[in-house]
Amino acid sequence: MRKTQPKKIPLAPDPKFNDRLVTRFVNNLMWAGKKSGAYIIFYDALDKVAKITGESGYDIWKKALTNITPGVEVRSRRIGGATFQIPAEVRADRKVSLSIKWMVKYSRDRNGRSMADKLANEIVAASKGEGASYKKKEDTHRMAEANKAFAHFRI
């Protein structure tokens, strides 16, 4: 194990919304180092979201991310030969990372023509409290609730 925590690399805000969270999302969306392509997909998806909902695509995306952000998760801990799933609160930076990764993963898994279409549909679904990424958050919370009896163990 390393002795010190590595320094966080400061991210540059994105050109359109001047938001570091957008850059973080685009970095996860990026495929094979093609960042400009990832930005095009993201902005295109937000335009499609705005067209579908009639509201700002950026605001809907923020709401969708908030909706799929997990509060608790289960972590495995081996105690006396048995492995227990112990519920634990999720750190703030991990919350954001998980929600971004889930949205990108389940957007890729969707059926659709282009990645922008699939991402737009997942954003709209997540903002309404539907979709695969929202279901993942609910499943995570359900697992933590089911294993509440082991919450007294330390992680």
Summary of predicted features, one role per range:
Residues 1-32, 36-39, 43-155:
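Strongly charged
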